[in-house]
């Protein structure tokens, strides 16, 4: 009989969202008349913009004609999209990238997982706590860790607590690590990193021959001009960092699927024989073997984001969500809650009222307010006592949810 990958049996974090779903279903069955508002999951609610949709339709029409039909595309992505990203997204930041350093994909979640294919299993990995579960779970799946302890920490991973005391920004590990996951603007805490803070991590990585895996999925939500959108705005980062970006929240592509990875040509690792080798070449080899490229209509739609009208429409949706974030942040703060995030980031990270665990507060919001959020403890032990709310909801629902919470907390 074929053997399974036993590493999957070590996973604990998969419990979070199924448990949320179970509790919500049980509540709905017992309270069929209740209107439940979901501010937990990070899915968008605004439709694709007219310019993006027009490009999508035109690309589909291309597939209907023998003269314009497109079959297999380049695994690295079409030049029309790569060129647009390099010129319209990175150059305005002062970042010069070669087109050969960019790889179009079907989403950054997959990329954050698949990038592990080009790293040796005996690398020491550091992740934040609380953290986007994909970083943790994919390292467990491939066999880099032992079992989780009673707190939920896996043996073999280095956890960097991100707490109220350190401004939700991780301190450098005491031990040497080879790979470091950083996510800014952060999911789930909504924290952002200054250029000086990122420079500290770049300097650390260069001094320790480490590689930073930088998740910039929410960079489009930054409004403060002093906050960097890319780690490559820091000198030296091309020698120590891989960057991930996504169209999911930026352009409403959660159901369309498109992302990108930047792997600089000067980024190198070491072979088992101690020789230097290009990570760019390894990732290209990986992609050409395991990936056939994002679809032509999707890439045409993504390229439309970078047209003048396309970006104007996209920015309007981003502004819509950030207004939601302001409403949530200010509304909950006025109710006496301690609130973080929601500025330069679409997530609000709040402290639960005294005496309530993350799951206690989840149950209170569900049962008393009919509002669903995400318990902070589901993102890691350091998330206990916190709660995440998303700004990606419909405006009317967001306003109503905040009013319900405010009214309940004043009782």
Swiss-Prot record:
- According to the record, the segments passing through the membrane are none
Q: Which residues carry this modification: N6-(pyridoxal phosphate)lysine?
A: 249
Q: What is its EC number?
A: 2.6.1.83
**Stored Gene3D superfamilies:** Aspartate Aminotransferase, domain 1 (3.90.1150.10), Type I PLP-dependent aspartate aminotransferase-like (Major domain) (3.40.640.10)
Q: Name one GO molecular function term.
A: L,L-diaminopimelate aminotransferase activity
Q: Which cofactor does it need?
A: pyridoxal 5'-phosphate
Mind telling me which InterPro entries this protein's record contains? Answer: Aminotransferase_I/II_large (IPR004839), DapL/ALD1 (IPR019942), PyrdxlP-dep_Trfase (IPR015424), PyrdxlP-dep_Trfase_major (IPR015421), PyrdxlP-dep_Trfase_small (IPR015422)
Alphabetically list the UniProt keywords: Aminotransferase, Pyridoxal phosphate, Transferase
Which first-to-last residue range defines the signal peptide? none
Kindly list the positions annotated as binding substrate.
15, 42, 109, 132, 187, 292, 388
| Catalysed transformations (reactions) | (2S,6S)-2,6-diaminopimelate + 2-oxoglutarate = (S)-2,3,4,5-tetrahydrodipicolinate + L-glutamate + H2O + H(+)
**In its UniProt record, which GO terms are filed under biological process?**
lysine biosynthetic process via diaminopimelate
**Which is one Pfam family of this protein?**
Aminotran_1_2
Q: Which residues bind pyridoxal 5'-phosphate per the record?
A: 72, 108-109, 132, 187, 218, 246-248, 257, 292
Under which pathway is this protein filed?
A: Amino-acid biosynthesis; L-lysine biosynthesis via DAP pathway; LL-2,6-diaminopimelate from (S)-tetrahydrodipicolinate (aminotransferase route): step 1/1
How this chain assembles, per its entry, is:
Homodimer.
Family matches, as NCBIfam families: DAPAT_plant (TIGR03542)
What this protein is reported to do is described as: Involved in the synthesis of meso-diaminopimelate (m-DAP or DL-DAP), required for both lysine and peptidoglycan biosynthesis. Catalyzes the direct conversion of tetrahydrodipicolinate to LL-diaminopimelate.
Q: Which family does it belong to?
A: Belongs to the class-I pyridoxal-phosphate-dependent aminotransferase family. LL-diaminopimelate aminotransferase subfamily.
Query: What's the protein here called?
Result: LL-diaminopimelate aminotransferase
| Protein's organism | Geobacter sp. (strain M21)
């Amino acid at each position: 009989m074929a053997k399974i990958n036993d590493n999957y049996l070590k996973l604990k974090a998969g419990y979070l969202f199924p448990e949320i779903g179970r509790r919500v279903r049980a509540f709905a069955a017992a309270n069929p008349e209740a209107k439940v508002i979901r501010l937990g999951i990070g899915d968008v609610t605004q439709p694709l913009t007219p310019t993006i949709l027009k490009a999508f339709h035109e690309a589909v029409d291309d597939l209907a004609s023998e003269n314009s039909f497109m079959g297999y595309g380049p695994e690295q992505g079409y030049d029309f999209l790569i060129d647009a990203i390099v010129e319209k997204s990175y150059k305005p930041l002062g970042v010069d990238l070669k087109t050969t350093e960019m790889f179009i994909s079907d989403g950054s979640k997959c990329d954050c997982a698949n990038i592990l294919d080009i790293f040796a299993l005996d690398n020491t990995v550091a992740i934040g706590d609380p953290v986007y579960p994909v970083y943790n779970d994919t390292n467990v799946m491939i066999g880099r860790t032992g079992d989780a302890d009673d707190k939920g920490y896996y043996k073999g991973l280095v956890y960097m607590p991100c707490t109220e005391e350190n401004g939700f920004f991780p301190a450098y590990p005491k031990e040497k690590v080879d790979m470091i996951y950083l996510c800014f603007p952060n999911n789930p805490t909504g924290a952002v990193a200054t250029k000086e803070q990122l420079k500290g991590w770049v300097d650390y990585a260069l001094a320790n021959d480490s590689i930073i895996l930088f998740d910039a999925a929410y960079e489009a939500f930054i409004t403060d001009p002093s906050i960097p959108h890319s780690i490559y705005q820091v000198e030296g980062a091309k020698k120590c960092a891989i960057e991930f970006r996504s169209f999911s929240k930026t352009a409403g592509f959660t159901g369309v699927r498109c992302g990108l990875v930047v792997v600089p040509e000067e980024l190198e690792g070491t072979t088992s024989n101690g020789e230097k080798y290009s990570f760019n070449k390894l990732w290209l080899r990986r992609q050409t073997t395991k990936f056939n490229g994002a679809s032509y209509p999707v890439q045409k739609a993504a390229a439309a984001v970078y047209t003048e009208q396309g970006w104007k429409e996209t920015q309007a949706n981003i502004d819509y969500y950030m207004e939601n974030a302001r409403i949530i942040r200010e509304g909950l703060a006025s109710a006496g809650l301690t609130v973080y995030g929601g500025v330069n980031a679409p997530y609000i990270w709040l402290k639960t009222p005294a005496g309530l665990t993350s799951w206690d507060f989840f149950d209170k919001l569900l049962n008393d307010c009919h509002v669903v959020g995400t318990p902070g403890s589901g993102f890691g032990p350091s998330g206990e006592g916190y709660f995440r709310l998303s700004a990606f909801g419909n405006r009317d629902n967001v306003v109503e949810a905040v009013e319900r919470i405010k009214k309940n907390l004043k009782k």
